[in-house]
Curated annotation (Swiss-Prot):
Key words, A-Z: Cytolysis, Host cell lysis by virus, Viral release from host cell
Entry keyword annotation includes DNA-binding: no
GO biological process entries: killing of cells of another organism
Cited function: E protein is responsible for host cell lysis.
Keyword Ribonucleoprotein: no
Biological classification of the source: Viruses, Monodnaviria, Sangervirae, Phixviricota, Malgrandaviricetes
Alphabetized Pfam families for the sequence: Microvir_lysis
Protein name (database record): Lysis protein
Length: 96
């Protein structure tokens, strides 16, 4: 009968902790549906395409104001859902 040393047991547990998550991820079925939530989560590609397709308007905030006095201006960017597949991007610059 072979006896395990403490270093052997620790090495085995370390390897097991490294490989076990990847094995579990491999065998999780990909057909499961995500849980239903009241919050709508926007995926990154959808969000980035909405931002790229939004018409851009010049702001009254110059970059120099943000460089020299960032505490005097607030740049606000909001994304509002206007219909099922339509979003509006609102960008505003306000004084504190």
């Amino acid at each position: 009968m072979e006896h395990w040393t403490l270093s052997g047991i620790l090495a085995f547990l370390l390897l097991l902790s490294l490989f076990l998550p990847s094995l579990l991820i491999t065998f999780i079925p990909l057909t499961s549906k995500p849980p239903v939530s009241s919050w709508k989560v926007l995926s990154l590609p959808k969000t980035s395409s909405m931002v790229l397709n939004a018409p851009l308007k010049p702001l009254n905030c110059s970059p120099s104001l943000f460089l020299f006095a960032p505490e005097t201006k607030i740049l606000s960017v909001t994304l509002k859902q206007t219909s099922v597949n339509s979003y509006a991007l609102k960008v505003s610059c306000k004084d504190l």
